Amino acid sequence: MKKLLKSVLVFAALSSASSLQALPVGNPAEPSLMIDGILWEGFGGDPCDPCTTWCDAISMRMGYYGDFVFDRVLQTDVNKEFQMGAKPTTATGNAAAPSTCTARENPAYGRHMQDAEMFTNAAYMALNIWDRFDVFCTLGATSGYLKGNSASFNLVGLFGDNENHATVSDSKLVPNMSLDQSVVELYTDTTFAWSAGARAALWECGCATLGASFQYAQSKPKVEELNVLCNAAEFTINKPKGYVGQEFPLDLKAGTDGVTGTKDASIDYHEWQASLALSYRLNMFTPYIGVKWSRASFDADTIRIAQPKSATTVFDVTTLNPTIAGAGDVKASAEGQLGDTMQIVSLQLNKMKSRKSCGIAVGTTIVDADKYAVTVETRLIDERAAHVNAQFRF
């Protein structure tokens, strides 16, 4: 049985090192791996000994914490219906632009994100008790990247309005077309991130250790760059701003310089995780395998961001969208020529959540002189991620 356990854990650890696959699980035996310190010797006394003091029971560890998520499995968390203009169904002419909102099927409902990445570098600090329990925290910085179909972001616009028609200045016009054949991606800045948790070695038998942990992490990065890759409305915004809690129609000045009532786009990230893992020590190597349950949310307050545009008409256009119908001869007297250009385009950053709650982690820890340790881990199923932790005991 011991040989089988050794074989399984070693194979899992070595396999994890050969592929790059939020919150790490960590080695369940970590509280008891480093039993000596670089400044103070470890204490292996009996907790029930009346002569033992808390000074003997407590120790500190510090080190580097790096967590790199290459693909987090996320989906949108939105309502089934979305309020916007009615979908055009007949040849009513360009002047018949909608002015009232109606409930339509939300194209963002249940959408899966194509890619979600997050990279964190932080300092790691742990308070150890009796070489069995760890209370730890991380303080550092994180950055992220999100990519998905434009339907996931409710990319909408008004199609069929006359650019040089008097109604273009009517604030009651609302978008009537949902654009779902394109891609939206965003990059966040590098911002402060923290996490806290606890880990315990619950059961030990020889060189095997069964342990559990619980962690919570939080960060709120701002959106550094937003790219909309769409043939009808393609644009890029650096440090985008938008409207929070604003229903259609948007302000006519939305997307222009000097507009008021907007705020910076930021994403409030929260995640909790509980895990159970089993390890087996083989001299200086301690491979482990574990399962985890986690829930992550990314909330941007459903901020709505408008396409950049000119505040005044220049050459009979306010946006530089490519035409759809191909009408390239724009004349002031030819009303409707610009009706084949998408107008008042905007998107919103919808709330996202974990699509899968359960995952597995495999890794190994290398311990040197019972004072230093390096852990390498990879996580699969609910995310593809790699984790590195290097620490020492005082």
From Swiss-Prot:
BP terms from Gene Ontology: monoatomic ion transport; regulation of cell shape
One Gene Ontology term of the molecular function aspect: structural molecule activity
Official protein name in the record: Major outer membrane porin
Compartment(s) where it occurs, according to its Swiss-Prot or TrEMBL record: Cell outer membrane
Leader sequence residues: 1-22
Chief location of this protein within or outside the cell: membrane
InterPro entries per UniProt: Major_OMP_Chlamydia
Taxonomic superkingdom: Bacteria
Subunit comment: Part of a disulfide cross-linked outer membrane complex (COMC) composed of the major outer membrane porin (MOMP), the small cysteine-rich protein (OmcA) and the large cysteine-rich periplasmic protein (OmcB).
